[in-house]
Regions:
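Extended, low-hydrophobicity, Ser/Thr/Pro/Gly-biased non-transmembrane segments
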Residues: 39, 55-163, 168, 184-187, ...
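Surface-exposed beta-strand/loop patches in extracellular or lumenal glycoproteins
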Residues: 1-10, 111-117, 429-457
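Long, ordered, helix-rich scaffold segments
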Residues: 310-312, 417, 422-424, 459-471, ...
Length: 816
C-alpha cells in the first residue's frame, strides 16, 4: 500500500508522516480534494505491514458557520464582547476540525490534549488527567475516551463557569455556561440527574463515560448534541429560570436534556453502522426522552402531548414525496437531511406502537439485549429486530419492516355494514397523484406496500360497557360482529398507533356525542385525523368546521393545539374578504373555554391548564383578532411592566398579542427587551414578538435584522420561516428571501437554511405557488434528500384545498 485516504476539508495539511513499528519514517505528498472532502497521502515506497503511527501537522480556522470547530460570540454581564470556541461534528464535520476517518463505523479511542490561554477553561469528553504549562500556554490532557465515532468528539474552550457536580453513582453531573448565567442551570441539572438515573435502571447498564457535563453554547445550530460526556446545547434548551418560565419552556428543557442523555447508550455506546440507520439513534432517544420525563413528571402527561409530535410526522409521511424511516444515504448533504420528523417523530411513534404491542417489559428486555450485545460497536436495524425477537418470541421483521423500510402509513377506515363492524386499510395520501414539479425525474421512493401489519386497538362500547379488542390488521379488510346494544367504537384506543382513522358519518357522530368519555389523546386524534382527511379531500371542510363546534368547552391543551393549528392553516388559505369570518369563527370556538378558565390561575391549578390559558389568549388575540382580548392583554402587560406578577404561562401570550396590535413605538420597546433579555426564554419571546408587528415598515425592519448580525444566525432562519407562515408578512418575506438567498446561504447554518425554506408552505395561492417553483428551479437549489420536494408538495396540498373549498368556505363563513 502506497496511499492513505482520509477525510479532511477546510484544513491546510503541512506535513503527513507514517512511522512504522521499526521507527522508520515516510513522508507523504498530500493532495486535498475539497469537493470530496478527502485528503490523499501518497508515499514514495510501499508502507510496511503491521502497526504504525500516522502523524499529521495541520492548520484550520475557527469558522462562524456553527459546524466543525467554530467560534461563538456573546456579551458578558458588563456588555463586553467575548468569544468561545466550540465543536459540532454530527453528521460529517469532525473532518473540518482534524483529519480523520469520519464515518460512524470507524470507531476509535480518542486522546484529546488542548493548549489554551491560561485564563480560559476547556472541556472535552472525559476528565482532565493532567495540567501543565508550556511557555505561555496551559496544556490540558484528557483521559482516553471509550471506543466511539468521530462525530461524538467534542471540545469547548472559553470563559466558563459550572455548577457544583451532583453524583449519580460514580458519575459527576455538571452544567457549564458562560459567566453570569449559572443561576439558570439548576433545572437542567435536575433533569439530567433524574434522567441519567432512569436510563441506568431502564437499560440495565451503567453510564459509559467518566463524567457528564452539559454545556450551554451561545451560538448553536441544532437543539443539542450528544457528545459523550460533554453534551452541548442551545442556551434555550438547557438554561432556564424555573420560576419565570412557562410550562412549554420548561418542557422543552426537560425533553432535550433527557433526549441527549438517552443517546449516551443509543448512539454513543451502540452506534448505527451508517447514516441510513440514524433512526436507531434519534428515534430511540426521542422515545426514551418521553419515558424518562413521563416517569419524572407524570402530571405533565408527556405521552398525550407526544400526539402533537406524532401528528407532525403523519403530516409529512402522508406525502408522495415522503421517504422510509431507513433510507439510502450516499453523501454528507443526504446525511444532514435525515435529521427530520420521519427519523425522530415517526421513528419514535413506531417504537411506541411496537412497545405497546409487545408489552413494556418484553420490549425493555429486548432493548437491554441489543445494548449488551453491541456495546462499543455498531449495529443496524436487523440487530435490533433480532434482540426484540429473542425477548418476545415474535416475528418482528414480519410485523415491522414495512413501517421502517417503506414510506407512508395506512388510513384505517371503519364503518358499520350489515350488522358488522368493517375495518379497512389503504395508504393515506393527501394528493391522489405525486406532485409534478421540475425535479420529478429524480428517483422515486420505493413503492409503498399494498398493506401493513397494523396493531389496532378497538374500544367497543355496548350496553354502557367498554371492552378493548386487539387485532393485527394484516389484510385489506376485516369484519367483526357488532355486540348487542352497540353504542360506539374508538379505533386506535390509547392513541399509540401510527395511522390515521376515518370514521363513517354515523360512527363519527356517535363519538362526538360521547366526547367527555374519550381520553384526551383520543379526542386529539379525532380532531387531527378529521382535519387530515379534510385536507386530503375525503371530507368537506364545512363538515370539519361543524365538528369543531363540539369542542367549545374542551379543556386539554393538546386537543386545542390540533384545533388551533387547523384554523391557522385555514387562515393562510381563505380569501382576504373571508378572513373576518374566519376570525369570528375562531372567537366563537375558543372564547367559551377562556371564559371558563378566566385570565388568572386558580389555587391548585395544574401546569397544563395554565399553559392552555396562555394558548387561548394568544389565539384569540392574534388568530381571532379579538379587540377585547387585545385590550385586556395590553392592560395586563402594562401592569407587568409596573411590576405586577403575571403567570409565566400567560406572559408570552400577552407579549405576542400586544405585538400583533402594536405600533412602531411598541416595536422599539420590544426590540430593546430582546437586546437586554435576562434569560434565553425571554430573549426568544421578544424576538418572535418582532415578527408579529403587522405594519409593512416594521416587517422590513425585522427581515433586515436576520442578515445584518443583530439576530444570531442560529435563530435568523427560524425567524424568516415564521414570517413566511404569517399572513401579514409572508408576501414581503418571500420577496426578501428571493432577493437575499445568496446572503442567507452564506450566513446561515445549512440546517437552518433548510428549515427556513419550509416557510414556503405558507404561500398558499396559485400565483405564489408558481413563483416558488420558478425560483427554486431557476436557482437550481438543492436542500438535500427529499426536503424541497416535500415542501413543494405540502404547498400543493394547501393550494389544492383552497381551490377545492374556497366557495364553500365563503358561504359558510358568511352565514350567521
Amino acid at each position: 500500500m502506497r496511499e492513505i485516504v482520509l477525510n479532511a476539508v477546510e484544513l491546510a495539511i503541512d506535513e503527513a508522516v507514517v512511522v512504522d513499528a521499526a521507527g522508520r519514517e515516510q513522508r507523504a505528498v498530500v493532495t486535498l480534494d475539497e469537493a470530496a472532502e478527502r485528503a490523499r497521502l501518497d508515499f514514495a515506497e510501499t508502507l510496511a505491514t503491521g502497526r504504525g503511527r500516522l502523524r499529521i501537522a495541520f492548520r484550520g480556522t475557527l469558522n462562524d458557520k456553527l459546524r466543525g470547530f467554530y467560534r461563538s460570540v456573546y456579551k458578558d454581564p458588563s456588555g463586553a464582547t467575548r468569544t468561545l470556541a466550540a465543536t459540532q461534528f454530527e453528521a460529517t464535520d469532525a473532518r473540518r476540525a482534524f483529519p480523520c476517518w469520519d464515518e460512524p463505523a470507524f470507531k476509535a479511542v480518542f486522546a484529546v490534549t488542548l493548549a489554551i490561554d491560561p485564563v480560559l477553561t476547556a472541556v472535552s469528553n472525559t476528565r482532565v488527567v493532567a495540567e501543565t504549562r508550556e511557555g505561555d500556554r496551559k496544556v490540558l490532557r484528557f483521559a482516553d475516551t471509550i471506543t466511539m465515532s468521530t462525530y461524538l468528539v467534542a471540545f469547548v474552550v472559553g470563559e466558563l463557569e459550572h455548577t457544583q457536580p451532583t453524583p449519580v453513582g460514580a458519575t459527576p453531573v455538571s452544567v457549564w455556561c458562560v459567566p453570569g448565567k449559572r443561576r439558570l442551570a439548576a433545572f437542567g441539572q435536575e433533569v439530567a440527574v433524574a434522567s441519567l438515573r432512569y436510563f441506568e435502571d431502564y437499560y440495565g447498564l451503567p453510564y459509559p463515560g467518566d463524567k457528564l457535563d452539559l454545556l450551554a453554547i451561545p451560538d448553536f445550530a441544532a437543539g443539542a448534541m450528544e457528545n459523550l460526556g460533554a453534551i452541548t446545547f442551545r442556551e434555550t434548551a438547557l438554561l432556564v429560570d424555573e420560576k419565570a418560565a412557562s410550562h412549554a419552556e420548561l418542557q422543552r428543557v426537560a425533553d432535550v436534556v433527557a433526549h441527549e442523555n438517552a443517546h449516551m447508550w443509543f448512539g454513543d455506546l451502540v452506534t448505527m453502522s451508517w447514516w441510513n440507520g440514524i433512526w436507531l439513534n434519534e428515534a430511540f432517544a426521542t422515545f426514551m426522552e418521553m419515558l424518562a420525563v413521563d416517569d419524572w413528571k407524570p402530571e405533565w402527561q408527556r405521552w398525550v402531548a407526544f400526539g402533537v409530535s406524532r401528528a407532525a410526522a403523519l403530516s409529512v409521511d402522508g406525502l408522495h414525496s415522503t421517504r422510509p424511516i431507513e433510507f439510502p444515504v450516499r453523501a454528507p448533504r443526504e446525511a444532514d437531511a435525515m435529521f427530520d420528523v420521519l427519523t425522530y417523530e415517526k421513528g419514535a411513534s413506531v417504537l411506541r406502537m411496537l412497545e405497546q404491542y409487545l408489552g413494556a417489559e418484553l420490549f425493555r428486555e429486548g432493548v437491554r439485549d441489543y445494548l449488551r450485545t453491541h456495546a462499543f460497536g455498531n449495529a443496524d436495524t436487523g440487530d435490533l429486530w433480532a434482540a426484540l425477537g429473542r425477548a418476545s418470541r415474535q416475528p418482528i421483521p414480519a410485523v415491522m419492516d414495512n413501517w421502517i423500510f417503506a414510506p407512508g402509513y395506512p388510513l384505517v377506515s371503519v364503518a358499520v355494514e350489515g350488522g358488522q363492524l368493517v375495518v379497512r386499510q389503504q395508504r393515506f395520501t393527501y394528493l391522489p397523484e405525486p406532485l409534478r414539479w421540475y425535479g420529478a425525474a429524480a428517483p422515486a421512493s420505493p413503492p409503498a406496500p399494498a398493506r401493513w401489519q397494523v396493531p389496532v386497538q378497538l374500544r367497543i362500547t355496548a350496553g354502557g360497557r367498554g371492552t378493548v379488542d386487539r387485532l393485527l390488521l394484516a389484510e385489506d379488510e376485516t369484519r367483526r360482529p357488532l355486540p348487542a346494544g352497540f353504542e360506539s367504537v374508538v379505533v386506535n384506543e390509547g392513541g399509540h398507533g401510527f395511522y390515521r382513522v376515518r370514521y363513517d358519518g354515523d360512527l363519527r357522530m356517535r363519538l362526538l356525542g360521547r366526547l367527555p368519555r374519550l381520553a384526551a389523546i383520543e379526542r386529539f386524534n379525532l380532531v387531527n385525523d378529521a382535519w387530515a382527511v379534510t385536507a386530503a379531500g375525503l371530507m368537506p371542510v364545512t363538515d370539519y368546521l361543524d365538528l369543531t363546534t363540539r369542542f367549545r368547552e374542551e379543556r386539554d391543551k393538546n386537543v386545542w393545539s390540533a384545533l388551533l393549528g387547523s384554523l391557522a392553516a385555514l387562515n393562510r388559505l381563505v380569501r382576504p374578504a373571508d378572513r373576518p369570518g374566519l376570525e369570528a369563527l375562531g372567537r366563537d370556538r375558543a372564547a367559551p373555554t377562556l371564559a371558563t378558565l378566566g385570565w388568572t390561575p386558580r389555587p391548585g391549578e395544574d401546569e397544563l391548564t395554565r399553559q392552555l390559558r396562555g394558548d387561548l389568549v394568544r389565539a384569540l388575540g392574534t388568530l381571532g383578532n379579538d379587540p377585547e382580548v387585545q385590550a385586556r392583554a395590553a392592560e395586563l402587560y402594562a401592569a407587568h411592566e409596573r411590576g405586577a406578577e403575571v403567570d409565566p404561562n400567560v406572559l408570552p401570550a400577552l407579549i405576542a398579542v400586544v405585538a400583533h396590535a402594536g405600533d412602531e413605538a411598541r416595536y422599539e420597546i420590544f426590540l430593546q427587551r430582546f437586546r437586554t433579555a435576562a434569560t434565553p426564554q425571554e430573549e426568544q419571546r421578544y424576538l418572535y414578538a418582532l415578527t408579529a408587528f403587522r405594519q409593512p415598515s416594521l416587517v422590513e425592519h425585522t427581515l433586515a435584522r436576520t442578515i445584518n448580525g443583530e439576530i444570531r444566525t442560529q435563530d435568523a432562519p427560524f425567524v424568516v420561516r415564521s414570517m413566511l407562515l404569517l399572513v401579514h408578512s409572508r408576501g414581503q418575506a418571500w420577496e426578501f428571501v428571493k432577493k437575499q438567498w445568496d446572503t442567507m446561504d452564506r450566513l446561515y447554518p445549512k440546517h437552518g437554511l433548510r428549515r427556513m425554506a419550509e416557510g414556503v408552505i405558507g404561500l398558499a395561492t396559485p400565483e405564489w405557488e408558481a413563483d416558488v417553483h420558478r425560483f427554486f428551479q431557476e436557482r437550481k437549489i438543492d436542500l438535500g434528500g427529499k426536503t424541497l420536494e416535500q415542501y413543494l408538495e405540502q404547498l400543493r396540498v394547501a393550494v389544492a384545498l383552497r381551490e377545492r373549498e374556497s366557495a364553500a368556505l365563503s358561504t359558510y363563513l358568511a352565514s350567521p
